[in-house]
């Protein structure tokens, strides 16, 4: 896998929103983004459901608190305690109802004005399963034995309609995985109290 510098342009924003506190990273994988966050001086609480990914992340970013847990389990942060949550390509494995519930739980751990920065599979991500697979529900397909959701801008707007203010929504392409991966990059703040 190639290095993906996507977080670099966001670091000043993340540092400001974190306000000296920890960043929670959902689905940290092997810890590449974890290491980037640490290098920017941000304390990190990260988790992934795959034990081998957690082991790799702990080796790459030993200063971070990294746990093995499922995104559907309770988060390792108290309600209203965080200024930033990062979720790069980790929110797309679930039904629409589960996805909404996860996003609501992310909102609950953020303080008012806190930032969620996420990347989501885009509906035109042809190399990684957006078309030609059995549908489970609209925008959710069974790809190689695993459910994968592919978002369009309308779905993102609906997902973050209640209790969020979208600051940035843009299509992007990552070259981390060998072939171009189409995705949506979303930054939104927790609105209200």
How would you name each of these model-derived features?
Residues 1-24, 29-78, 101, 115-193:
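Class I (Rossmann-like) S-adenosyl-L-methionine-dependent methyltransferase catalytic domain
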Residues 86:
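A conserved beta-strand element that flanks and buttresses the S-adenosyl-L-methionine
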Residues 89-93:
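Short catalytic micro-motifs in class I SAM-dependent methyltransferases
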Residues 96:
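Short, conserved catalytic or interaction motifs in soluble domains
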Residues 100-112:
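A short glycine-rich, Lys/Arg-flanked "PGG" loop and its adjoining helix->strand segment in the class I
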